Swiss-Prot record:
SMART domains with a match to the protein in the record: DSPc, RHOD
Protein name per UniProt: Dual specificity protein phosphatase Mpk3
Predominant location category: cytoplasm
Domain Tyrosine-protein phosphatase, chain residue ranges per copy: 214-358
PANTHER family reported for this sequence: DUAL SPECIFICITY PROTEIN PHOSPHATASE, DUAL SPECIFICITY PROTEIN PHOSPHATASE MPK3
GO cellular component, one term: cytoplasm
Compartments, as annotated in UniProt: Cytoplasm
Annotated EC: 3.1.3.16, 3.1.3.48
Domain Rhodanese: 22-149
Region of interest called Disordered, as start-end residue ranges on this chain: 184-209
Length: 411
């Protein structure tokens, strides 16, 4: 076993450890993209495909590694043996340098903006035992293919896992603000819902009081973001010519539905870990497009107007304007600084972004702000997606305090 001051391990050492009785003390983190991981990975490894906006928080110590783990079993392993287990980090091609001594924080012999370097530095700072696979996955697979799982094996395991509780994916975020300060009546009626938008709503009410006084116009003449109060404010709805209301809650009433003056779409989603908001993206996008075609305005709201409604708005911007998740988030936050999406909804958006990139003709180039621009047309991809809507179930409803898009080039 490598000494604690060593940064890297060889493929031979890793294979010997996988064969040993102590393999349960190894935690393998695959730092490649999710697509590469799904094709093949080292047996027992979990994929750590972290959005750059989250990676930065991990780098500066605002969240810990356990906070990004979705699997309860793996999270328990990390928490109980954080400084006892060996963390093995690997990418596709490997890292340069052999067994270099760590002279101080940030001395890992890989690019400083890589996931591996950030993880290595952070784990070392926490006193953990961590090495990077010098040879990389590609060389390891060539030497020891029997210790790798291919796409079919992974897919079979995912199907089996989905029959029970979906706990085999990475990317869960534990609460950074777990206590709620509003009454229970303000939260979702779901007994299992953590629905911490109520906590966030209270927090931002004090920190950014003016953000909640009126719905916020995200796309001029088309889309406003708001909260429960705004959805019941008839004067505000009239003032902004809002004729469509997208209600992203399971239990808030559609107050003016019976009048017939406003068209509603309700997406019954809480912030609980079991919720799949992505599966509703097609309907939500179609509803907003309908409002645009009718030269009307839509209000997208949830309880606090900072998480679920923001997620839907981001999906719309990504699909119709071809924005990346980072760019869409920056655009929305520039107009509404108190946005605070649920971590797992952000992960669903990351998957949605990947879907958009994989479909020819699904990406756009939009620099305008007009709601009737030609670049906001539904494509063939959307038609297919509407017919076969799928999504990734999240595993947390705990509110994330603040998202910050990357400006350092971290990917």
């Amino acid at each position: 076993m490598p000494e604690t001051e060593h940064e890297t391990c060889s493929k031979e050492w890793l294979q010997s450890q996988l064969r040993s009785l102590d393999s349960k003390d190894l935690i393998l983190l695959d730092c490649r993209g999710s697509h590469e991981y799904s094709e093949s990975h080292i047996r027992g490894a979990v994929n750590l495909c972290i959005p750059s906006i989250v990676l930065r928080r991990l780098a500066v110590g605002k969240i810990d590694l356990a906070s990004t783990i979705k699997s309860p079993e793996l999270k328990q392993r990390i928490q109980s043996g954080y400084k006892l287990c060996w963390f093995i980090l690997y990418n596709g091609e490997g890292v340069p340098g052999q067994n270099q001594e760590i002279a101080g924080a940030g001395s890992l012999a890989v690019a400083m903006d890589s996931i591996i370097s950030i993880l290595h530095r952070r784990l070392k700072q926490d006193g953990c035992r961590v090495v990077a696979l010098q040879d990389g996955f590609n060389n390891f697979r060539q030497a020891f293919p029997e210790w790798c799982e291919d796409d079919n094996q992974t897919h079979s395991k995912e199907i089996e896992s989905s029959r029970n509780v979906q706990t085999d994916q990475l990317m869960g975020l534990r609460s950074l603000r777990i206590s709620t300060t509003q009454s229970d009546s303000a939260c979702s009626s779901s007994a299992e819902s953590s629905d911490c938008e109520s906590s966030s709503h209270h927090h931002h009410h004090h920190s950014h009081h003016n953000y909640n006084e009126a719905p916020v116009e995200i796309i001029p003449g088309l889309l406003f973001l708001g909260n429960a109060t705004h959805s019941c404010d008839s004067e505000a709805l009239k003032k902004y010519n809002i004729k469509y209301v997208l209600n992203v809650t399971p239990d808030l009433p559609n107050k003016f539905k019976e009048s017939g003056d406003i068209k509603y779409l309700q997406i019954p989603i809480t912030d609980h870990y079991s919720q799949d908001l992505a599966i509703h993206f097609p309907d939500a996008i179609q509803f907003i497009e309908e409002a645009r075609s009718a030269s009307s305005v839509v209000l997208v709201h949830c309880l606090a107007g900072v998480s679920r409604s923001v997620t839907v708005t981001l999906a719309y911007l990504m699909h119709t304007r071809g924005l990346s998740l980072n760019d869409a988030f920056a655009m929305v936050r520039d107009r509404k600084p108190d946005v605070s999406p649920n971590f797992h909804f952000m992960q669903q958006l990351l998957s949605f972004e990947s879907q958009l990139r994989l479909r020819p003709g699904s990406r756009f180039s939009c620099s305008c702000i007009a709601p009737d621009c030609n670049c906001m047309q539904t494509t063939g991809f959307m038609a297919t997606h509407l017919a076969n809507a799928t999504g990734v179930s999240p595993d947390s409803g705990i509110e994330f305090d603040r998202w910050t898009p990357s400006d350092t080039g971290l990917k």
